[in-house]
Amino acid sequence: MQDFWQAAAAQLERELTPQQFKTWIKPLAPVAFDEETHALRIAAPNRFKLDWVKSQFSGRITALACEYWEAQVSVQFVLDPAASGRAAAYMQPAQPGMGPGGMDGHAAPGTGMGGYPGAQPMGGQAMGQPPFAMPGQQPGYGYGEPVSAAGYGMGQPPYGNPGNPGNPAGMPSAAPVPAGARGQPHPGQHGHQPHGADMGEIDVVQMDPAEASARSYRAPPQQPQQQPHQQMGGATPMPGHQPSDTVHERSRLNPILTFDNFVTGKANQLARAAAIQVANNPGKSYNPLYLYGGVGLGKTHLIHAIGNFMLLENPRARIRYIHAEQYVSDVVKAYQRKAFDEFKRYYHSLDLLLIDDIQFFSGKNRTQEEFFYAFEALIANRAQVIITSDTYPKEISGIDDRLISRFDSGLTVAIEPPELEMRVAILMKKAAAENVNVPEEVAFFVAKHLRSNVRELEGALRKILAFSNFHGKDITIEVTREALKDLLTVQNRQISVENIQKTCADFYNIKVADMYSKKRPANIARPRQIAMYLAKELTQKSLPEIGELFGGRDHTTVLHAVRKIADERSKDAQLNHELHVLEQTLKG
């Protein structure tokens, strides 16, 4: 059994990133193998790791076991808090020739399962806590929101059982915590044992070899981005510190959304740098951090990544992610139950508050008042506050001026729509995660036609993959064009050069007639060049046709304008934002 686990671990170490191997595979320990029933039992140290290993790696481990023992093997995952300690012993070199692998039941010297080299010793030290990294099966790629509604905490208030007679509002009785005491457990949490953590409890996953082979297992990228403390010089998490099995449920953080799977480009590099700085220095720099941008651009991904990193650094930290609508709902419930004292104690004692889409507070005066008090208390206690919105603070209507001034008091960072190269990179990564080879020219074709947000890109990719599978065709530009014909038709529908000229003239406050005139002042020539660029990008008109519609200009003039604006768009975030607004307006 030790030979098998060393060989399996060696193979998985080659397939996974170092952080993922240390986080998910190294803490596991084989418990027993029944030679009669071919049942293998593997222990995980806590429910959190058990659930993730079972959901992400059980198929691969089962396949390796079947290959090693040359039989149908079922894998049973056992919950055992002492597993991490025993795992180190199983990583020690084994005696040669003690495991199966041939007709005589002995492995060939120096070989492991499937003929690959036997495992080398990996050290006998107990596992420390590596940087937080989830298996890469559902990456967020820098853009996109939580993969499940549960990440928003909708319908799940942050406090306890409303039916508790000793606590009518169902809220905890935590008192405000001074700055010096942050990171201590909640009252009543000492000695807490996670549900289901009894020694010897078993969760069983059984698969035959066919199912194990059929079950998808996708190796993540081999060169992940570094964790924040590695980039910014923060301290490495202390050994033994790890999020408990219920900590993500309490915080409403989505563990899949991390810095590792956040794709960075010019459009979001400043926001990511600010997020990393905050993750390493919560409550000290950039407080509050205010991120704003359109839908599907990665705001929620970034704030979850901050929370997940801080949770790794200090699993006892009181962290709460909440959507603004749910915060409003919590205020209403507290009002109905006359439980504002408990409500305040909960929110005022957090170490990190992540609140999404703050624009939903518009017009809700009581909610704004309660949030103002919570904000003031958290800042006074040096807790970190992170806010997202779809617009700049001063542009939000229906929000109290004193709140707006608080939002502006920290760091405000915009996340812009991704540039062409970044959209291509996101599509290629998403395709790789699906184990599908998408030609680069196809990715460029899709990225060129779909610019609004990355959710739209991912939806288009799913349509292409489904169309290719259903029709048994390779993915080409022709197949892509056919798969996306409805989407592309909608993109180009009702967009005319005349409409583009009028929209640009209104946007830049010039006359439509200036689009055809020979005037060359900068305040006219620039909008005219932008309109030419959009006409080339959003219509099927040729360069000569566009030139004719702009006062009979030569096609070389149009080509110069298109190239000039395209080049400046890749370098100028403000221009990129303006073009994005114009494109969205034209597409309706």
Curated annotation (Swiss-Prot):
Main location: cytoplasm
Pfam families: Bac_DnaA (PF00308), Bac_DnaA_C (PF08299), DnaA_N (PF11638)
Region annotation (Domain III, AAA+ region) ranges: 252-468
UniProt-listed SUPFAM superfamilies: P-loop containing nucleoside triphosphate hydrolases, TrpR-like
Annotated stretches, region: Domain IV, binds dsDNA: 469-588
GO cellular component terms listed in the entry, alphabetical order: cytoplasm; plasma membrane
GO MF assignments: ATP binding; ATP hydrolysis activity; DNA replication origin binding; lipid binding
Record keyword Transmembrane present: no
Entries under InterPro entries matching the protein: AAA+_ATPase, Chromosome_initiator_DnaA, Chromosome_initiator_DnaA-like, Chromosome_initiator_DnaA_CS, DnaA_C, DnaA_dom, DnaA_N_dom, DnaA_N_sf
Keywords tagged on the record: ATP-binding, Cytoplasm, DNA replication, DNA-binding, Lipid-binding, Nucleotide-binding
GO biological process: DNA replication initiation; regulation of DNA replication
Origin superkingdom: Bacteria
Subcellular location: Cytoplasm
Residues that hold ATP according to the record: 296, 298-300
Residues covered by region (Domain I, interacts with DnaA modulators): 1-73
Biased composition (Low complexity): 118-140, 155-176, 183-196
Ranges where the record places region Disordered: 104-141, 154-198, 212-247
Residue ranges of the region described as Domain II: 73-251
HAMAP family: DnaA_bact (MF_00377)
Domains as described in the record: Domain I is involved in oligomerization and binding regulators, domain II is flexibile and of varying length in different bacteria, domain III forms the AAA+ region, while domain IV binds dsDNA.
Function of the protein: Plays an essential role in the initiation and regulation of chromosomal replication. ATP-DnaA binds to the origin of replication (oriC) to initiate formation of the DNA replication initiation complex once per cell cycle. Binds the DnaA box (a 9 base pair repeat at the origin) and separates the double-stranded (ds)DNA. Forms a right-handed helical filament on oriC DNA; dsDNA binds to the exterior of the filament while single-stranded (ss)DNA is stabiized in the filament's interior.
Family: Belongs to the DnaA family.
The protein's assembly and partners: Oligomerizes as a right-handed, spiral filament on DNA at oriC.
PANTHER family reported for this sequence: CHROMOSOMAL REPLICATION INITIATOR PROTEIN DNAA
Protein's name according to its UniProt entry: Chromosomal replication initiator protein DnaA
